Amino acid sequence: MKVIALRRDLVSSYADTQVYEHDVDKDYYENAYLISNITAHNVLYVDYSIQVIEILNKSGIASLIAINKDKLEILIKSNYTYDYYKNIVYLHDYSYYNLNELRTDQYWLTTTNIEEYILPGWKLTYVGQLGIKTRGHYTYSFICQNTATDDDIIYDYIYSNEVDFLPFLLQALNKRLTTAVNFHRLSNRIFREYLYSKVPKDTINIGPRNESMFTLLRYPYITNYAANEFKVSDLIRLTQEKWIGAENSQFDIGQFKNMCNVLSTIYYYYNKYHAYPRIYMLGSAPSYWLYDLLQVYNFDIETWDPLDTPFSKRHHKAMFAISDTEKLSDNSILYIDIRSDRNGADWREWRQRVEDETKINLEIMRKYLQRGKTRICCCKITAMDIELPATSILLHFPTTKIQSECYVICTQEMLQDKKRFVPKGAFYSFINNTKTDNVFVSPVYKVKPTNKFVVALYSLSNENNDRDKVIDFTQKQKRGIITLRMNNTFNYEYRLQFKSTYDYLYLPSEVSREGTIVTSYDGYIAMHNLSLSLESKATGNNHLFISFSDANYGQIDSYCTHMGISRRSHSVRFSEAATTLSGYMFRDITNGKFNLINTNVENAVSGHVYNALVYFRYNYRFDLLRWINLHAKDEVMIQGGRYYEHAPPELLYACQSALVFAKLQNDLTLIEYVNSVNRYILNKYNLKYADDPNYYIHIDFVDLPFKYTVPDPHLTGGLLFLNDFDIQNTITILRSVKEDLIALNLLTQYTYMLTDSIYVANVDGYLQFYYKLYMKFYRKQIVFGQSRMFLPHITLSKEKKKPVRIDATKLVIKSIKLRKIKSDVEYCI
């Protein structure tokens, strides 16, 4: 959802929009809570409060002020990620299609012939990283830029088996315009920029993908693990093949291949030396992608090529000779992409020339690596019978046409390793069947606890990582942020097919622990000053964000809060339910409380916990177990709102109701989740029951509207099991709440048979006070309350009577006493 604060005169009618007027009788948090549970996607917030807007943004709900119609229009019609600290709106909006325009953040693409193969009359526009160059398109009080591009379509094409680009593009556009936009993919690009800028220097980054190829250039101190190394020694496993030479792309993507090769070498250098290297490139022209590289960091780049390399710092318009290796300095990488043009030469002659050039390239690599220190080389080679260092790394990024070439990354240590003879056919097998798809070339990270800070976004759920080891990791890892795929199934599957592999599934209760926040994407990014206009949906591809040793763990009213916890419930309640009170009635009935009068006011069950359980697929931004843990330890820091501390019985009753709900729905996953939360509550609270009580709270009244035959009709305000040391504390507590108790609006409306022989009158208005009293006794370790549901009533007779109904009658308290059972001992309160 999104909240747009505005003047009353700007309010207009839009689809899926509701107006909320600030309620001056409620505080900021209560107003924010009410707004967050509105079911409309757009909320127009009139007579707004800045404090309410801040609360909503910190809860992950994008909330902005619109001061005119233009701002209102752009905020209503677009979805976005909002930096509420810097006041930047990152739009995720494809409306530029009505300009007959595709967009890219890759400058090199605009220098190719791609426009010959896109829709007639269309053009490709470069917008810079995160659409930075679109800022000039918007003139609002907030900074605004559009991050949407079509690079995902182009990349999918590059890695597909399709050659004709236009049909591929049309199909992709049709899909984009008829299905839900991949919103979190767009928003994640912004989030990663913010996250990586804040991680410590000892960070381990597990599973980065090409989406971060430019983002992570700023952080050489981060160690990346992508589990994608293919070594020369791995070629021996391949069946030998022949040259195919297949077309891969209609437009020229040679620069893409070169860009990825150089980036792969840079990141290999980062992992090894954690510093920025000087970059040498041989055969560099035209390398327009250097433009984007230099926007991120001012690399020292020196190049050699007879043709121009526009963005090189020092370009030598000449061929590089072997003797020139003496000019190359330490702390550098060398990219060798030398190959002369065929120019119609006979294929045998051409083949011999290519093999000779490969030998020269490898000699340049050898001489470069043998001199100095802290050097890494990426060298072009052709498929041929040759010896190479066994541990060197092979790359084969897509290019316009699959030829006989690939690339090898070699370090100074690899050069000293044993050599492995590789036949030509093994190279062809690698080239024909492999498209390297990740510039973060690195080994597998073995999932085990470490003292370092770990970032693992969307990379640990796959079947390569043992599920039990991952759960153990979540319980022992001290620092970091990881994601795991949430179990959204209904039959409690432990894994689910995802693309070509399986993902293991996890429930929040399996990974929760002290100090760890478990939340949704929008819940986590709010701690990085970001909020979203589009909440998480229960798509089946939802991820738990698990933040270890989070400094915000105790900030229960600031981050990952209960905001929006009833939104799904409201949606069902007002559109599908038998009555708008269905939820209240269901919760009471399933726990044996059959007095449904004022059930929405005097409910025996925690509605918060119930909603968090039954709609956990929608509400997992709210970290329920963290909430329970902080309450159990009495460490809740409340900043505002109508705070009510739930007693553990209310939490357990919520679990009971949720369990019945789950069984009615045949939701096996929810059954498991509810049972695990129930166990968690029992573990966190030291519950003792007065099932064999020796004292009770005796409340009698001035007058009763019903006839009675018992000598002393009264309300039992609670049963206790006290030792001699507890009595004075109990009296002190009761006297401290005496005025509150007397002020209660206690009512009675009917009589009923509590058992076959006990005739009672109901008492309304006491139950919520009972739970407040429960917590006061619990904090003092005084045993109060029984294991069964507490039903406030007055015993009238011990024989069967006919039930009576009357108008609600107020009960006036006459006296309050603490009495010992089967004794004359009593203490007046």
UniProtKB/Swiss-Prot annotation:
This is Protein VP3. Its main location: virion. Multifunctional enzyme involved in mRNA capping. Catalyzes the formation of the 5' cap structure on the viral plus-strand transcripts. Specifically binds to GTP and displays guanylyltransferase and methyltransferase activities. Has affinity for ssRNA but not for dsRNA. Capping activity is non-specific and caps RNAs that initiate with either a G or an A residue. Together with VP1 polymerase, forms a VP1-VP3 complex positioned near the channels situated at each of the five-fold vertices of the core. InterPro entries: VP3_Rotav. One of its GO terms (cellular component) is viral nucleocapsid. The keyword Ligase does not apply. GO terms for biological process: symbiont-mediated suppression of host innate immune response; viral process. Residues 171-242, 426-551 are annotated as: N7-methyltransferase activity. It comes from Rotavirus A (strain RVA/Chicken/Ireland/Ch2/1979/G7P[X]). It comes from the Viruses. Belongs to the rotavirus VP3 family. Interacts with VP1. Interacts with VP2. It catalyses: a 5'-end diphospho-ribonucleoside in mRNA + GTP + H(+) = a 5'-end (5'-triphosphoguanosine)-ribonucleoside in mRNA + diphosphate; a 5'-end (5'-triphosphoguanosine)-ribonucleoside in mRNA + S-adenosyl-L-methionine = a 5'-end (N(7)-methyl 5'-triphosphoguanosine)-ribonucleoside in mRNA + S-adenosyl-L-homocysteine; 5'-triphosphoadenylyl-(2'->5')-adenylyl-(2'->5')-adenosine + 2 H2O = 2 AMP + ATP + 2 H(+). Contains a bipartite N7-methyltransferase domain, a 2'-O-methyltransferase domain and a GTase/RTPase domain. The C-terminus contains a phosphodiesterase domain that degrades the 5'-triphosphorylated, 2'-5' linked adenylate oligomers produced by the host cell in response to IFN stimulation. Its EC number is 3.1.4.-, 2.7.7.50, 2.1.1.56. One of its GO terms (molecular function) is RNA binding.
